[in-house]
Regions:
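Active-site-adjacent structural elements that line small-molecule/cofactor binding pockets in enzymes
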Residues: 1-202
């Protein structure tokens, strides 16, 4: 289901194609709804894109918001946050560890080896969508970047305050996080860019 009649390309296949016709462009999902995806396949696809692009893949992931979309994909909408946390552990291990196994409430992975590994070590960076307190905690634990969706410049600061606090609890700082915001206003372009830049985002 979509809010518009504009279709969206499947991201991993699209990024693989883009990897073959570019040399320096960073390639990321913005975002892949991880609780809808099999984590083993997502890890395999991500590693392939990272190899094809020689280490330019960004794993942009999020929870999703549409129960209708989850139903269409045949995946449960409930407990998607807890499911995503387990999937993140599985994907991270498959990318970073020589052997992987996992036993959780929503996913079990017998001991296995996934090859080839990504170029980026220990693994491609995770960027996260979402603006809730839980989302900020997830970024602080796993992330290298944050995608803010349709936020006005004045709405960015409270999220960054929350994120800074969560990062500090883990001995991290905001300087370690790439901040990317999709515009949520109709300001002229130059004024808009200046307003977001004052908040530290691109």
């Amino acid at each position: 289901p979509s809010l518009t009649q504009v279709g969206l390309m499947e991201p991993m296949a699209t990024l693989a194609a883009m990897a073959m016709c570019s040399k320096t462009l960073r390639l990321g999902t913005g975002i892949a709804i991880l609780p809808q995806r099999n984590p083993v396949y997502f890890a395999k696809e991500g590693a392939a894109v990272d190899l094809l692009s020689n280490g330019r893949f960004i794993a942009g992931v999020g929870l999703g918001w549409s129960g209708q979309e989850f139903a269409a994909a045949g995946t449960p909408f409930e407990h998607r946050g807890s499911r995503m946390n387990e999937y993140l552990e599985v994907v991270r291990s498959l990318w970073a560890d020589e052997t992987s196994s996992f036993e959780g409430r929503f996913y079990s992975l017998p001991e296995c080896i996934q090859l080839p590994k990504p170029v980026q070590r220990p693994h491609p960076p995770f960027y996260f969508g979402g603006e809730s307190e839980v989302a900020m905690r997830r970024i602080a634990q796993y992330g290298r970047g944050w995608f803010g969706l349709y936020l006005k410049p004045e709405d960015v600061a409270p999220r960054l305050t929350s994120l800074t606090e969560e990062l500090a609890k883990r001995g991290r700082s905001l300087s370690e996080i790439d901040l990317v915001v999709s515009p949520g206003n109709d300001l002229p372009v130059e004024r808009m860019l200046e307003a977001y830049a004052t908040q530290g985002v691109s």
